[in-house]
Design a protein with these regions (language model features):
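N-terminal secretory signal peptides
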Residues: 1-8, 19-26
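N-terminal export leaders
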Residues: 10-15
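C-terminal motif of bacterial Sec signal peptides marking the signal peptidase cleavage site
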Residues: 29-30
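Bacterial Sec signal peptide processing site at the extreme N-terminus
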Residues: 33-41
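Post-signal peptide N-terminal segment of secreted/secretory-pathway proteins
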Residues: 67-135
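Non-catalytic, conformational "gating/processing" segments within enzyme and secreted inhibitor domains
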Residues: 79, 118-273, 298-372
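Extended hydrophobic
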Residues: 201, 254-270, 375-410
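Internal alpha/beta scaffold segment
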Residues: 263-265, 272-297
């Protein structure tokens, strides 16, 4: 579906959630693994740095499809909303790339800090944030006992905080790890275990934080939200009045940064004047740079943000193929056995309400061993489709990247 050329109907808003140092106790009761088929949308952003997390995030969201008002992959029902973790996907690709001798277009050494930078917020995964924010991050490489891993590779991924565990690759084993490391918020693995799957990389991220300035439930009202196809739906719109905070309202963007409790993690809400298809990583980066703490301009604001919750199950094979980690990738730094990457998936969810935000993602890569003997004054209202990105307030590193096309849809 094409978008209206009326600027009021074609503006979207990006909400980049920059992680704040305090977590919000949200009552999340139904953040479970997505039941839908895998979303296979992937739009490569050519001419951009493929190790850049904003580039990865926009590619995974399928920016061209969003501009057309389309949902997920062509072989499944359309969804107006998507959430991905660029950090989870990039970390999975980076750890696998450390074992590759074939050409890849990402730089693992540059991606590694994006996985390890959240250690100061480490805690148990929860859907009820407390006085301080929690970012629970865990990972492992599960290896069949018959598959020898090179010591050099083992040493390399230790720097990623990725231990190697020896054990049979079974559905029960993978499911148990996912449930344990997401506090039960994701119910099981997204991989389909096959007889030739001998190595599995798993990582999990759970984020929970309270707003520094919470929205008042009594102020939440029904409000019009214009979807990508121009139709209008009614949403639960939360409001902040006389709110002093960072904003932008020029050069093709309206936006605001909403901090979590210690101001180190934040939500960046960005509403582009142009169609979604015209949003590039460069334009997005320029807008974000005006909201980070070093460059912020503040004012008294009136802010409207819809409540939303949804899940996405994402097929990452398009992304892996694009960066040189397709089935033909040579992983000879990892093991001398013939191997191929056979599955790559991510399950993600996000919940935003008056108290704060809870989000999570599980990223998994299944590697097969070949069958051989070797075996206020300014009003900013998110009343049309927007991006919601979770990251830190200083750099806006995108831990989670969401597109919200209809807040009423789960």
């Amino acid at each position: 579906m094409s978008l209206s050329r009326n600027p009021l109907n074609r503006r979207r808003f990006l909400c980049l959630l920059g992680l704040s140092a305090i977590a919000a106790p949200l009552l999340v009761t139904a953040c479970t693994r997505a039941e839908a088929q895998l979303d296979d949308s992937f739009t490569p952003v050519e001419g951009e740095d493929q190790s850049d997390l904003l580039t990865i995030g926009l590619s995974l969201l399928g920016s061209t499809d969003l501009a057309r008002g389309q949902g997920q992959g062509s072989d499944q029902q359309s969804s107006p909303n998507r959430v991905v973790s660029p950090v989870g996907a990039a970390a999975a690709a980076g750890v696998i790339a450390e074992g590759a001798t074939s050409k890849v277009t990402i730089d693992p050494k540059r991606l590694q800090p994006a996985w390890t930078m959240w250690r100061k917020w480490a805690g148990e995964p929860t859907n009820k944030p407390g006085a301080v924010p929690v970012i629970s991050a865990a990972a492992r490489l599960l290896v069949d006992p018959k598959i020898p891993i090179k010591p050099e590779y083992s040493d390399t991924i230790t720097g990623w905080d990725v231990p190697i565990e020896t054990g049979k690759v079974t559905k029960g084993n993978l499911d148990s790890w996912v449930r344990t490391n997401t506090g039960g918020l994701v119910k099981g693995s997204g991989l389909t275990v096959t007889p030739d799957m001998k190595l599995v990389l798993q990582n999990a991220i759970i984020f929970a934080a309270k707003w520094l300035v919470p929205f008042k439930a009594d102020d939440t009202i029904k409000y019009d939200f214009t979807k990508a196809d121009g139709t209008i739906t009614r949403v639960d719109m939360m409001w902040l009045f006389q709110h002093h905070g960072p904003y932008i309202a020029s050069d093709g963007w309206q936006g605001v940064r909403l901090d979590y409790t210690d101001k180190e993690l934040s939500a960046f809400i960005l509403i582009p004047d142009d169609d979604m298809g015209e949003v590039t990583p460069t334009k997005l980066r320029q807008a974000l740079s005006r909201l980070v703490t070093a460059q912020e301009q503040t004012a008294i604001l009136k802010v409207g943000l819809p409540k939303f919750r949804f899940t996405t199950s994402k097929d990452l094979k398009g992304f892996f193929n694009h960066v040189g980690l397709g089935e033909e990738a040579a992983l000879t730094k990892m093991t001398n056995l013939p191997t191929k990457i056979i599955q790559a998936v991510q399950q993600a969810f996000i919940v935003v309400d008056e108290e704060g935000t809870v989000a999570g993602a599980v990223t998994e890569v299944g590697v097969g061993a070949m069958a051989t003997p070797m075996t206020g004054d300014i009003t900013i209202i998110a009343d049309r489709p927007f991006y919601f990105i979770v990251g830190d307030a200083k750099t806006a590193t995108p831990l989670f990247f969401s597109y919200v096309g209809d807040p009423t849809k789960g």
